[in-house]
């Protein structure tokens, strides 16, 4: 019985199949944790969702910003961008089933026995675990509800960018969504800065990566996240693991076996990705 954690897949179906085969993943006895952003950029988003859904209870995943964007596109709220390569998924005969399954997935995973927390972008140092769990439940509840299109329409935006227990309604949901799925940098007081995507050595003062600021969760738990491909898994504290290594950009798909902290990496089959948006090419 092993627990495997895999970084952002982004529709890289072939690489996902290869890495699962390499570690001989067995859904009957093993558990697979996925950091979110299952879809977009790669050509196999449809196949990735079908595979992950077929694995049933052996999978523990969290939603990423691209997964939420897919939900918004399918609901007619956001535009389908050709660069995301999700048209085959949107037009698939089982699209309704896949989308309804996806919107019922969590934004936070916690294993108390392993002292392990996973969120796509991370956990703000302003939260303790009880607050993170409460905010996650609120986002998850609205995604499962009939009013989820209203939330998807309102989730885009960078404000509010500072936590207060007094936040309520859509403003509170937007802040929580940004923490769980979009956050990279904070100011020293923990306030979010949502525009900078540079690597830490290029970021302007006084910005700090969220994981560089002490917080109640990181003091007691290991944290696994994705989202930040330009880190290439480097530069985090020893108990915080960034697993997005830019597979959809020509990097690698990374897997971590939790029991012995052993890494497995599969090179992307998109070695010629030259988009100006490529975060790992700089």
Swiss-Prot record:
<keyword id="KW-0378">Hydrolase</keyword>
<dbReference type="InterPro" id="IPR029052">
    <property type="entry name" value="Metallo-depent_PP-like"/>
</dbReference>
<dbReference type="Pfam" id="PF00149">
    <property type="entry name" value="Metallophos"/>
</dbReference>
<dbReference type="InterPro" id="IPR004617">
    <property type="entry name" value="ApaH"/>
</dbReference>
<dbReference type="InterPro" id="IPR004843">
    <property type="entry name" value="Calcineurin-like_PHP_ApaH"/>
</dbReference>
<protein>
    <recommendedName>
        <fullName>Bis(5'-nucleosyl)-tetraphosphatase, symmetrical</fullName>
        <ecNumber>3.6.1.41</ecNumber>
    </recommendedName>
</protein>
<comment type="function">
    <text>Hydrolyzes diadenosine 5',5'''-P1,P4-tetraphosphate to yield ADP.</text>
</comment>
<dbReference type="GO" id="GO:0008803">
    <property type="term" value="F:bis(5'-nucleosyl)-tetraphosphatase (symmetrical) activity"/>
</dbReference>
<comment type="similarity">
    <text>Belongs to the Ap4A hydrolase family.</text>
</comment>
